[in-house]
Amino acid sequence: MDTEYEQVNKPWNELYKETTLGNKLMVNVGMEDQEVPLLPSNFLTKVRVGLSGGYITMRRIRIKIIPLVSRKAGVSGKLYLRDISDTKGRKLHCTESLDLGREIRLTMQHLDFSVSTRSDVPIVFGFEELVSPFLEGRELFSISVKWQFGLSKNCYSLPQSKWKVMYQEDALKVLKPSKKKASKTGSSV
């Protein structure tokens, strides 16, 4: 799999305006290519790709991620691509450690993976192996951003037909309540 990625320095407000731009996925359905956008889940956007043929392959994925945390926090992590059709979550791809305080642009020319049109085989992108220089804040920055590809259990078209639905999910890991210390130090990031 050929992968290119870069990190960009821009003010956060400029990056926020671009949050819906640049995230695209080229899907090969049978003999045809279809380009679909990837949008954050809060846009409540789902893209329908008509099912035809036995398998769907994914190519030319372009993902732009705006900063997830403050640049001053110094949080870094690796972007993983996993097949989560089983409990092992087989790794399909992994980047080098990236600064989560900057914009990340990721381009993948081809995924060595096909999704059957008759089964539910989700593929997930997410940040793992997060590292923070602030020991107490490591769990605080356990933020995952996932792009999940899978079959929908519902019909989204009239007349009724089967559709492949692709959606992006933003998920915050639930922080476990920690034991309160007798004395707290007022440090913030």
From Swiss-Prot:
GO terms for cellular component: host cell membrane; membrane; viral capsid. Its main location: host cell. The keyword Phosphoprotein applies. One of its GO terms (molecular function) is RNA binding. It comes from the Viruses. Phosphorylated. It is found in: Host membrane. Keywords: Host membrane, Host-virus interaction, Membrane, Phosphoprotein, RNA-binding, Transport, Viral movement protein. Pfam families: TBSV_P22. InterPro entries: TBSV_p22. GO terms for biological process: transport of virus in host, cell to cell. Interacts with host protein HFI22. Belongs to the tombusvirus/aureusvirus movement protein p22 family. Transports viral genome to neighboring plant cells directly through plasmosdesmata, without any budding. The movement protein allows efficient cell to cell propagation, by bypassing the host cell wall barrier. This is Movement protein.
